[in-house]
Amino acid sequence: VQTCALPIYFRDRARAFREGFDAAFADLCGGADVYYAGKSMLTLSTARWAAEEGLRVDTASGGELAIALAAGVDPAHIGLHGNNKSDAELRTALEAGVGRIIVDSLDELTHLAALAAEAGRRAPVMLRLTPGVHAHTHDFIATAHEDQKFGLSLAPASTDRDGNVAGRSPAAVAVAAALAAESIDLLGVHCHIGSQIFEAEGFGLAAGRVLEFLAEIKAEHGVELAELDLGGGHGIAYTAVDEPRPAAEIADALADDVQKTVERLGLTCPRISLEPGRAISGPAGLTLYTVGVTKTVDADTPDGGTAARRYVAVDGGMSDNPRPVLYDADYTAVSARRTSEAEPVLSRVVGKHCESGDILVRDVYLPADLGRGDLLAVPATGAYTHVMSSNYNALARPAVVA
């Protein structure tokens, strides 16, 4: 098994986001900043490609921050995410001079302020908010519900627990605390509504709610925050039924929504940023497997009958791509070594792990003569495969060729 990362695809997708959003927001707020979400696939190469295409880099741990810095990314163009950053991670970010630290809670804000004061620095902070927008996506990867670990709610708190003030939103309390802290430089706010999103409506709704919150901040504190990050979640085509919109179309629709809202609220448009990850790295990756055992079984059908299903086992599985197991993610597969005139038959591509759920592609038509030693290619595996891989069953992690 081997994962191939194709620079030309990565660069093309990165450029499409940068140019599309820059053009859409040029007149409104001087353009947009695109942060590549490194959690989707971060290596020295992908960090360097992103920077060379004019993107910034979003990291989610001290390890990812170290990779971005080692790749030569300008620290001022790096963001550090994470709902539970360690002291070491925060101190490293402060010492390196990262451009933004995205803060998820009042607890973290208070702690970061103390660390920054101790270091004699001002921490550049974006407050992550949960706008209550529910994207049409899998429950396990939706991140804008109120009952979840990320962000500060825009809804009023019901109790005074953990720094909350009953009747006041945790987001409003955090903004007041950030503005009052001498060691905090409050740049703006951030939100993220989910993953694998194909339409622009969700982003526009989230932007509207957050901009209304910025208007409340202006009214209460006399301050207009300068930046608004709308996160990532832009979808890609894993199979033929997926139809994501081009980056430029999403950008144009979002810019129109933002312009109408800032004009209605009497706000100066904040600098817009976004964090595509999968949308850039996903299509740039291709996993090659070697076929081993094949067998045909009788499978039950919904009408009570039976149908033949062919199982195609490969030399990898859930250790190199856990997404089908974790999220019921769909992929497709094609024969990669040779052409075949054999009839395509309904097949299920499975891994070699000691797990009945070790399924890579649930239903796909593959040549009936596909057999031992043939190569099978699974496209769109550039995101959340290699970075989530493991050594389960003591299998080796596959190499990445870039």
Task: Tell me what each language-model feature is.
Residues 2-6:
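Short, small-residue-biased leader/transition segments that mark boundaries at the very start
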Residues 9, 192, 227-233, 269-281:
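A glycine-rich phosphate-binding loop feature that marks nucleotide/adenosyl-phosphate handling sites
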Residues 9, 41, 64, 85, ...:
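Short, glycine-/Ser/Thr-/acidic-enriched flexible segments
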Residues 9-16, 173, 209:
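A non-catalytic, amphipathic alpha-helix used as a structural packing/dimerization or gating element
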Residues 26-227, 257, 262:
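Active-site-proximal beta-alpha core segment in soluble small-molecule metabolic enzymes
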Residues 199-212, 243-252, 286-297:
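Short, electropositive alpha-helical surface patch
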Residues 236-243:
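Catalytic palm subdomain of template-directed nucleic-acid polymerases
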Residues 253, 259, 263, 267-402:
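Charged (often Lys/Glu-rich) extended helix/loop segments that serve as interaction or gating elements
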